[in-house]
From Swiss-Prot:
Main location: membrane
Short name of one Pfam family: Ammonium_transp
Topological domain spans for side Extracellular: 1-17, 70-108, 161-173, 231-239, 289, 352-372
Gene this chain is encoded by: MEP3
Annotated protein name in UniProt: Ammonium transporter MEP3
Keywords in alphabetical order: Ammonia transport, Membrane, Transmembrane, Transmembrane helix, Transport
Compositional bias per record (Polar residues), positions renumbered to this chain: 448-481
This protein's GO CC annotations: endoplasmic reticulum; plasma membrane
Source species: Saccharomyces cerevisiae (strain ATCC 204508 / S288c) (Baker's yeast)
């Protein structure tokens, strides 16, 4: 048929499956702003907006990379003789408009979109490594190269029919290796190359907005439910089971971390609660479609304990992993993959009606443990080495040095890299100190207003408050050497 004659699509698909996957892709994407709010709240105020920006921009980079050659490298159907990486047969989303296989009930295009959102989440997690000291443009260059050389090969290993891990029988339901461990190791290595933040700037450091941390965690949990459930690729019993497993693991993970923090601080920590929930969600990522419900209860407890203590690793290795990517994503991902070897059951895996697997130790498949461990080691090792090479090479190229200057770090990434601020009133207050205010003129204005107070007592009260605030601010300015220094600068 010639072009322009009118073409009617004759392929038929199951509408419920297509709708399920579209909804799943949308909710996985919704995790991206959740990560942005989480990271922003955990950082200091002067870099709050930069972390939201870098997470969103990481998603844009990921979408472009996936469209050009990412999907083809990760899921090529014609690279059956290559167990490491796909080819460019689907470059630019070519040949992805039919069924992904003869017996599939959905078009390959929706599968490509769904997997694209998974990579966007992985890149957004890594973006947190730039916290308070990383340049933004070089990080975007890093993410594009990283997605090509690291994410696509490891994803091909585990999810493409030609990958060695897929053929070996590794159990990784929704990305414990190619998303969680990969993003954690990459973020940790990137933090190493960035170097530590200035110690004098970390005195009395604490998250600037715990409410935003809580909001981000809630959004993540909401999106994570379909992140795991929709990995069944159809609305079946296995997706329902994965949904419940995700909730159980997050619940016990949050409770466990919170109790551990209370044991040492004798206070209930909201940040600790959110950290534990995230650890439980991460652990459920590779296991929620494979293990039993009571296994998820135990998994959340183990993840909460192990990840809580794993936050100390960065101090021993002297790496400024400011957002604890290694502990909360890497170690939790390892826990989930190990639990697949322990608690995976053949009857859980078979709930989708199509997948056959012997399960783990629970169903007497003893060799599953070394298969899982080998996959963990291969994913983490390959990611660490290639990420280090990418960071080293980029650091030698003029214009793409990874770290900002000391002055920019002290000023904050919002002002140095963005030019906008998460909280304008903070910058108005700073400008007030730098510009200075004529207090004599303000006193004259306020005294004139006082003479009219008999006719308008409300206005008198407001002017008095303004006068007090102004004088107080001037006194603070005159007694604070840091503000004098800022004005001179």
């Amino acid at each position: 048929m010639a072009r322009g004659d009118g073409h009617l699509w004759t392929e038929t698909y199951d509408s419920s499956t297509v709708a399920f996957m579209i909804l799943g892709a949308a909710l996985v994407f919704f995790m991206v702003p959740g990560l942005g709010f989480l990271y922003s709240g955990l950082a200091r105020r002067k870099s709050a907006l930069a972390l939201i920006w870098v997470v969103i921009m990481a998603t844009l980079v990921g979408i472009l990379q996936w469209y050009f050659w990412g999907y083809s490298l990760a899921f090529s159907k014609t690279a059956t003789n290559n167990k490491f990486i796909g080819n460019l047969d689907s470059f630019g989303f070519r040949n992805v408009y039919g069924k992904i296989s003869d017996d599939s009930t959905y078009p390959e295009l929706i599968y490509a979109i769904f997997q694209m959102m998974f990579m966007c989440v992985a890149l957004s997690i890594i973006a947190g490594a730039t916290a308070e000291r990383g340049k933004l443009f070089p990080h975007m260059v890093f993410l594009f190269v990283f997605a090509t050389l690291v994410y696509c090969p490891i994803t091909y290993w585990i999810w493409a029919p030609g990958g060695w891990a897929y053929q070996w029988g590794v159990l990784d339901w929704a990305g414990g290796g190619n998303i969680e461990i990969l993003s954690a190791v990459a973020g940790f290595v990137y933090s190493y190359f960035l170097g530590r933040r200035k110690e004098n700037l970390l005195i009395n450091f604490r998250p600037h907005n715990v409410s935003m941390v809580t909001l981000g965690t809630s959004i993540l949990w909401f999106g994570w439910l379909l992140f795991n459930a929709a990995s069944s690729l159809s609305p079946n019993m296995r997706s329902v089971y994965a949904f419940m497993n995700t909730c159980l693991s997050a619940t016990t993970g949050g409770m466990t971390w919170c109790l551990l923090d209370y044991r040492s601080e004798k206070k209930w920590s909201t940040v600790g609660l959110c950290s534990g929930i995230i650890c439980g969600l991460v652990a459920a990522t590779p296991s929620s479609g494979c293990i039993t419900l009571y296994g998820s209860l135990i998994q959340g407890i183990i993840a909460g304990v192990v990840c809580n203590f794993a936050t100390k690793i960065k101090y021993y290795l002297k790496v400024d992993d400011s957002l604890d990517l290694l502990a909360e994503h890497g170690i939790a991902g390892v826990v989930g993959l190990i639990f697949n070897a322990l608690f995976a059951a053949d009857w859980v895996i078979g709930m989708d009606g199509t997948t056959k697997h012997k399960g783990g130790w629970l169903t007497h498949n003893w060799k599953q443990m070394y298969i899982q461990i080998a996959y963990i080691g291969a994913s983490a090792g390959y990611c660490a080495v290639v990420t280090a090479i990418i960071c080293f090479v980029l650091g030698k190229i003029p214009g793409v040095h990874l770290r900002v200057t000391e002055e920019a770090e002290a000023l904050g990434l919002d002002e140095d890299q963005i030019g906008e601020f998460a909280y304008d009133y903070v910058e108005v207050r700073r400008d007030y100190y730098q510009w200075g205010v004529d207090t004599d003129a303000l006193h004259t204005t306020c005294n004139g207003a006082n003479s009219a107070s008999e006719t308008n007592p409300t206005e008198d009260s407001q002017n008095s408050s303004l006068s007090s605030a102004t004088v107080s601010g001037q006194n603070e300015k005159s007694n604070n050497p840091k503000l004098h220094h800022a004005k001179e600068a």
